[in-house]
Curated annotation (Swiss-Prot):
InterPro entries in the cross-refs: UPF0178 (IPR003791)
PANTHER family: UPF0178 PROTEIN YAII (PTHR35146:SF1)
Domain of life assignment: Bacteria
Family: Belongs to the UPF0178 family.
Origin species: Bacillus velezensis (strain DSM 23117 / BGSC 10A6 / LMG 26770 / FZB42)
Protein name: UPF0178 protein RBAM_023530
Length: 168
C-alpha cells in the first residue's frame, strides 16, 4: 500500500528513546518511566539481541552498522520526547527539535553546551589520528548514576507537571 505507513507509537504519547548498545542505566530508566507511565524504547544492534529481555521492555533491533541505532532514533523521535545517548553527534541533531537529550552520566546536552562537546570530540579524534591516545572515560560510578536519575526525574516531572517527590 503505497503512501501508507504503520506507526507503533501513539502520536501523543511521550517516549524515552535509549541508545541502548552500551547504556549502563537501563534499569534506572525503566524504574523511573514506570512510575510516571512513560513509554521507553531501547534501540540496539542485532549484535546485542537477547531472548531474555523482559516483556515490559520495548526493544527495537537495527542492523549492526555504526550509525543504525542513531538513525532509527533520529527518524522516530518526536518533539517533546526524551533521548538517552552518549553520542554527541546524535545529540546535536536532536536539540533543535524540542527533544530533551541527556547522557547516561546525567549530563544534559543543550544548545549552550553542544558546540563545546562537538569541538572536544573533534580535537580528540584529531589527536588519535596523529597517534596521541588518551584514556577513555572513567567507569560509571554511583555519583554518575545518581546524577542521571536526578536529571531524568527532573525532565519528566517538568514535562508532566508532577512533583519530583512523587517519583521515588
Amino acid at each position: 500500500m503505497e503512501g501508507w505507513r504503520i506507526s507503533l507509537l501513539n502520536e501523543k504519547e511521550k517516549t524515552i528513546f535509549v541508545d541502548a548498545d552500551a547504556c549502563p542505566v537501563k534499569e534506572e530508566i525503566m524504574l523511573i518511566a514506570s512510575q510516571v507511565s512513560v513509554r521507553v524504547i531501547f534501540v540496539a544492534s542485532f549484535e546485542h539481541y537477547q531472548l531474555s529481555r523482559s516483556k515490559d521492555e520495548n526493544w527495537v533491533y537495527v542492523d549492526p552498522h555504526k550509525e543504525a541505532a542513531d538513525l532509527y532514533i533520529a527518524n522516530h523521535v518526536r518533539s517533546g520526547d526524551v533521548v538517552v545517548t552518549q553520542d554527541i553527534g546524535l545529540a546535536s541533531l536532536l536539540l533543535n527539535r524540542n527533544i530533551a537529550v541527556l547522557s547516561e552520566r546525567g549530563r544534559s546536552y543543550t544548545e549552550d553546551t553542544i558546540d563545546f562537546a562537538l569541538m572536544s570530540r573533534h580535537m580528540s579524534g584529531k589527536m588519535r589520528r596523529s597517534g596521541i591516545h588518551s584514556k577513555g572515560p572513567k567507569k560509571l560510578n554511583k555519583e554518575d548514576r545518581n546524577r542521571f536519575v536526578t536529571l531524568l526525574k527532573k525532565i519528566l516531572s517538568n514535562d508532566e507537571g508532577i512533583s519530583n517527590q512523587n517519583i521515588e
